[in-house]
Amino acid sequence: MRFSIKMRASARVSSSPSTSDGSSGDHTESRDRADRHISGAERIVSASDIMQTVTELEHRAWTHSNGQPDDVVVSVHRVDEDEITHIPALTRETRHTHTVDDAHRTITEILRDAGIRTAEHALKALTRIRGMRGAMLLDADTGERRDTKDIRGVRVTALDNDMATGADAAEEMSSSAATKPYYCEALTLASKVQYHPAVCAELCISDDPDYTTGYVSTSGRYVRIENIKPMGSPQGGRVFLVRGTDDEIADCINYLENTAVIVHGIPWPPQDNHSAHRDEPDAFGAIPATDIATDLTTFAEQSLTAWENKGLRRYPLEFSSAPMPRTTVAGSDTLLFSSSNYLGLSEHPDVIAAATEALKHYGAGTGGSRLTTGNFTIHTSTERTLAEFTGYDDAVLFGTGYQANGAALATLATNIPEAPSTAPANTPGMTIFSDELNHASLIDGIRMATRGNAAVRIYPHKDTEHLENALAQCASPRKLIVSDGVFSMNGDIAPLPSIMRLARAHGSWVLIDDAHGTGTLGRTGRGIVEYWSDARRQDAGADSSPGEELPNDSDLQPDLLVVTASKALGSEGAAVCCSTPVAEFLRNRARGYVFSTSSAPASVAATQVAVATILREPERVHRLQDNSLYLRNQLREHGIPLVDGTSNSTPIIPIFIGDEADAVRISQGLSDRGFHVPGIRYPTVARGQAILRVTTMATHTRDDLDHLVDALRDLMPHSA
């Protein structure tokens, strides 16, 4: 169960505004109006978030740059889960227009391209709006108003977003209602509006005098338009262009005003000068300019306090033994169900011996980068080992998976070609297509890649139909599809055959981060490529669609496969597996490789021997897979719900809780019983979608798994 919270703030005025030419008009506020809109916002939250959300919305109302309100009204209404419609966010792009005239020309061109014959009329109507709280509905073909033609317009209500573009990045991308991130709110509203089939397009200008970026949206597409109005102008409004019968338009209005919608896949706002209110706290709990301390320590203390007040501060637990099933956490003996040491190789005697020998032979550190004095024999031999293990010609070692993803993505965005002259105006030279639940390291790498002539389009999670449409519409000469192999929160697997088929059809490169698949997927633990290769050889045990045509093994290989040593291999570091020319390109151009000290020989040697151990002891992989399937089956048998869509083949098992307070309570209850299972809640996952994230290891016994199920049955009231 969730609750819809709405805030409206207004100031009383003695007379109404008029149109810019001084005359009263059909598109302006009536002279009978007795108040001026200051601010409005809404959220859909779980019960545990109501009080904090109300406080944030009230703060926003009283600190808005539109002025001091006389009246602030906050309402709370219950919304049943089955009443909520879940939809994906529109695909996004930005037009860097430099003048108001340029912005208006761009809007007109976009509308004409979308088949809107009344583009100029719609834009003129938009620029004449003053004080209308809702949106004006205009017929896309005739320009006539299709709503009730009053001063209120159509109010789009009952909406929110989950603000999740990747599981581990969600916290970084979160923002309270008080911050009013215009881009995220606008994209949420536009996505809801465009979801109704009667809506052809939407135009929007914010009424905030300090915010000059507006947008136009058409069929599945959201385009930010910079400098849509002069700085300081109070002009603002919305126009929806619609087609349909009177009954269809009435249904559209009812949907816009009454249907509860949560939009998924809203990304982090673009980093420009117009993405946030001035003097308001940002997503990290920043302090208004008037309160910022002059010294760093005080600034940090204030920011931490703001972060803690939102319930977002974290404190790392101290582990004092190896990450084995039975370990010591914060001084207590604990049964560990949260480690990525999936195969138990971090404590394998052969792996430890290899690290020890390398430490003695090479020393503790390398003293240089790979291109200076840090390229040891163990580095090159381990790269060959990883390349052979994954079936590639070459591999390039990096210090961490985060570094590997960031360096690879930023490097692929060099020497970007210009779009052909036949492409639409402002087409970027490179477009990156990113799954909405990708890991933070991919998201940050894409941010670095899109600082130049590159853009990103975020597609709904594993939605290959949406991806295909986006690729078909893309005129960029360079395309790149980026996805996790195994998604770190839900434990589901990327549809690699479909991704590769689309990439070949549309001339796109592919990068897959197989951090959680390396050592865990496939009959010998070689990862996602082997997993899907196995799927064509046997019908059982693979998450493939019935009848899906699987290509041969070589066609399953992405251009770049990122593998990490810090999870199933029990060591640290990562590698980008690829062709030899691509590897040499990375060694010469990837800044994370060129300017970083090479990995410690002990870790690299441990990685090499871990791979050999997997090949020598394949039963470890099989035992991990058996444990994962057994625990999933036991949880389901006892009525403990798993997150929809999670795979049976990965060691990541997300247990659905929903309410954030329940997740904290159950996680603490497990801790009291000697288990370590973290509760994952907002902002790492969407509000009201809290989970317990369980991971299995090959070294867990069946008794370990059964004890966890018993504890969960005691703590979860609806389990059997």
From Swiss-Prot:
Coiled-coil blocks: none
Substrates-to-products reaction catalysed: heptanedioate + ATP + CoA = 6-carboxyhexanoyl-CoA + AMP + diphosphate; 6-carboxyhexanoyl-[ACP] + L-alanine + H(+) = (8S)-8-amino-7-oxononanoate + holo-[ACP] + CO2
Keywords: ATP-binding, Biotin biosynthesis, Ligase, Magnesium, Multifunctional enzyme, Nucleotide-binding, Pyridoxal phosphate, Transferase
Basic and acidic residues compositional bias, start-end: 24-39
Residues given in the record as pyridoxal 5'-phosphate binding sites: G401, Y402, S488, D513, D514, A515, H516, T564, A565, S566, K567
Region entry Disordered, spans: 1-39
GO molecular function (one): 8-amino-7-oxononanoate synthase activity
UniProt keyword annotation of ATP-binding present: yes
N6-(pyridoxal phosphate)lysine modifications at: K567
Family: In the N-terminal section; belongs to the BioW family. In the C-terminal section; belongs to the class-II pyridoxal-phosphate-dependent aminotransferase family. BioF subfamily.
Function: Catalyzes both the decarboxylative condensation of pimeloyl-[acyl-carrier protein] and L-alanine to produce 8-amino-7-oxononanoate (AON), [acyl-carrier protein], and carbon dioxide, and the transformation of pimelate into pimeloyl-CoA with concomitant hydrolysis of ATP to AMP.
Protein name per Swiss-Prot or TrEMBL: Biotin biosynthesis bifunctional protein BioWF
Organism: Corynebacterium kroppenstedtii (strain DSM 44385 / JCM 11950 / CIP 105744 / CCUG 35717)
